[in-house]
Structure formats: C-alpha cells, structure tokens
Regions:
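Active-site-adjacent structural elements in enzyme catalytic cores
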Residues: 1-198
C-alpha cells in the first residue's frame, strides 16, 4: 500500500500498521527509514539483511521520554539537561542504560511527532537499504525495491537530507561517532557552562 504523506488519514493509517507489528517505510526528519515497534525487529532484520548485533535507533516524541529508558544515575543533572536541550533535532544520542546502551532521537518534524503520539511508544528507525549499501532517498527506487516486502510505504517525495549526527554518551569520554546535519558543542560540558544550541 502506498500513502501520500499529506493525506488526511495518513498518520492514523500508518500508526495502525505499526501497531499490527508491521514494518513500514516512512519519511523521517533526515532520510527515509524502515520503522516499527521493537517486536518487529526480527522482520526488519530479515528484510534489510542486517546483522542483529547492530542496534537500531529509536525515535521518541518528546525529549523527556528518554529519561524512562536510560540510566539517569550515570549522568549529572547538568549533563542530562544539556543533552535533552538539543532535542528535537537530527541528533541521535547513544545513552547508557542499566544493562547496556540505547540509541534515541527526538525528531524535529510535526508529522513524525504526530505519528509517535498516535503509536504511543518509541519506534525504531533505520535507513532504507540493504545492509552495506547506500541509503535510498528516491521514492520511486524505494517503491520499486521494497513494495513487495513492505505492507505500507508513505510517500513524502524525494528526500535530500543528511543522516543524523550520532554521539555516544554511554561511556566517558563522550564522543561524536558520525557528523551529520547537526553540531553539538561538547566543550560546554567540560567547562560547566550553559549549553550552546545550534
């Protein structure tokens, strides 16, 4: 099924597919992504031919939702406030949890926020491609390649975005793993000053 992003019931329909444990393709705040609930990860890994050891990014509706999933005792209040102040933006943050790590992003996109609100929980997001290949941004190519395997593709036109910046704050020293379309100034943490937002 193909839906246009601007269609009136697009969010409700997309949400219903996700809640049925389907993997869908949606336009995100950066590029097109495979998305779904955590319980649909096995399906996603099969479609994408991705190694299950590679963790997925999860999208959240509001910055403060991250506090439910991370080890807040690992961070100072300033550090927590600093990271949350940079959302919503195309910034993926790998946090420490009680037992391992989790990668979260709070997207700066009204449509995505509406979808996350409708679903009522975080959803995974990973680039549309076969693992090891370049991410796909041309919607015609995406439809041609995945329409048989994916029950719902949301058409938001061609996206010429840049992948999100990824930072790892699950251990010290904190570091940038991937430079994307967003810049974060880590010096603010070491200097103990108020964060600069870009």
């Amino acid at each position: 099924m193909i839906l246009q992003k601007e269609e009136k019931n697009c969010i409700a329909t997309t949400s219903s597919f996700i809640l049925k444990n389907d993997v869908v393709i949606i336009p995100t705040d950066t590029i097109y992504g495979f998305s779904g609930l955590p319980s649909a990860e096995t399906t996603l890994l099969s479609i994408k031919k991705r190694d299950k050891s590679k963790k997925l990014i999860y999208l959240i509706e509001k910055p403060e939702i991250a506090l439910k999933y991370i080890d807040i005792n690992f961070y100072s209040k300033f550090e927590l406030d600093f990271f949350l102040s940079h959302w919503p933006n195309p910034l993926t943050i790998i946090y420490k949890t009680k037992n391992e790590t989790i990668a979260l992003r709070c997207p700066k996109d009204n449509w995505l926020s509406g979808l996350l609100s409708s679903v009522g929980s975080p959803i995974f997001s990973t680039s549309v491609n076969i693992s090891g290949n370049n991410s796909m941004q041309d919607i015609i190519d995406i439809k041609r390649s995945f329409q048989k395997d994916i029950p719902l593709i949301v058409d938001g036109g061609n996206i010429n975005g840049t992948s999100s910046t990824i930072i790892d704050v699950s251990k010290r020293p904190f570091k940038v793993l991937r430079n994307g379309s967003y810049f974060i100034n880590f010096d603010a943490i070491s200097q103990g000053c108020q964060p600069r937002i870009y």
